[in-house]
Amino acid sequence: EFLNKYFAEKASLYGLKLMVSAGPTHEPIDPVRFIGNHSSGKMGFALAEEAVKRGADVTLIAGPVSLETPHGVKRINVKTAQDMFDACTGNFDKQDIIIMAAAVADYAPIEIASEKVKKKAEDWNIELKKTKDVLGWIGDNKKVNQKLIGFALETENEQANAFGKLERKNLDIIVLNSLKDEGAGFQHDSNKITIIDRNNKVTSFELKSKQDVAIDILDTIENY
């Protein structure tokens, strides 16, 4: 009985289902080239690992990254924005908490060459199309009892843009990163965040390891 009580106190997310997306997407141009971004997936993986420690049943939707799957996490690998959309929308309905930490491409090539495109003398113009807005779709379709958390990476008017995204996407909480903060953001093992919720509460944190940032984010979600 003592052990059950101890683990119940430690496992604050026990019995809850949590989905987190992580990493970039790669939008192919031809068999060897793609449009991508610098996301490492480290923040999303840290969140998945911390959520499992708290007893959650975790599904991790991972873009193309070279990271080991945290113990106890169900991992679904995806490559493109369309893959990410399909995996996230296909799994969101049964989740209690949804954390969308992936950096999903906003645009993808209209045409994908079946063979490697050879270098030519002239310029190469690639026409792009908008990808499906996975965060917006989940925001439009989420149930009252589901908590939806998004991320914003901004370079100017950071808080104003984050508040706007919070409203547009029907989020409960948004985690703001700034490219202006040294040691934070893509590729780093540390991050510096500001968390904003629908009650207009704004909490800024110092630079920390992404493991400690994951603790701050999940603490905020639990107390929301």
Enumerate the predicted regions with their spans.
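YjeF_N-associated NAD(P)HX repair module
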Residues: 1-19, 109-112, 177-181
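Glycine-rich phosphate/nucleotide-binding loop
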Residues: 109-206, 211, 215-219, 223-224
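Glycine-rich phosphate/diphosphate-binding loop of Rossmann-like nucleotide-binding domains
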Residues: 12-80
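Short beta-strand segments
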Residues: 19-23, 100-102, 152, 177-178
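A glycine- and small/hydrophobic-rich beta-loop-beta segment
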Residues: 64, 72-136
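Generic hydrophobic/aromatic pocket-lining and core-packing "Φ" positions
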Residues: 32, 44, 48, 88, ...
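C-terminal alpha-helix
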Residues: 2-6, 91, 216, 220-224
